[in-house]
């Protein structure tokens, strides 16, 4: 598998959201999409990142931008997370890690000297035609929303 680059066609996928409905990236043709991958529901960094997207969602929607969050958690976990923090955008369950691997964000990580596999916090901005407009890799949860908002104000 090759790493994705700016200008590449974003790989399409079909994943279930918190309500069990199938969501495809191709459903959003004609809109820009912020596709953000995060490690785990209801953990401190992931909660900050999700709440920052929530708090800026109106501004993003005015710019014809959809936000989709993806983690390896299941639909039930996403439902609890979304309800707890009033997250108005879709969280998608990549429990089999297929999409995370395809986007090259599921990889070997190291925390406190312990190695494990998981999602590296990353975001793909996808244009109206399904092409990758920008890639943010290994982002800082607290500050990432500023990068995203700046991307759409160019």
Labelled PLM ranges:
Residues 1-154:
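Chalcogenol-based redox active-site neighborhoods
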């Amino acid at each position: 598998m090759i790493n994705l680059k700016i200008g590449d066609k974003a790989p399409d996928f079909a994943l279930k959201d918190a309500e069990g409905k199938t969501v495809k990236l191709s459903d959003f043709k004609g809109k820009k999409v912020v596709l953000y991958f995060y490690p785990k529901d209801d953990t401190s960094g992931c909660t900050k990142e999700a709440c920052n997207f929530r708090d800026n969602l109106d501004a993003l929607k005015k710019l014809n931008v959809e936000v989709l969050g993806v983690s390896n958690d299941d639909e039930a976990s996403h439902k609890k997370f979304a309800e707890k923090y009033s997250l108005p955008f879709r969280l998608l369950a990549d429990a089999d890690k297929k999409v995370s691997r395809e986007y090259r964000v599921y990889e070997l990580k190291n925390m406190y000297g312990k190695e494990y596999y998981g999602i590296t916090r990353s975001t793909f901005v996808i244009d109206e035609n399904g092409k990758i407009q920008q890639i943010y890799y290994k982002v800082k949860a607290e500050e990432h929303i500023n990068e995203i908002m700046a991307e759409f104000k160019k």
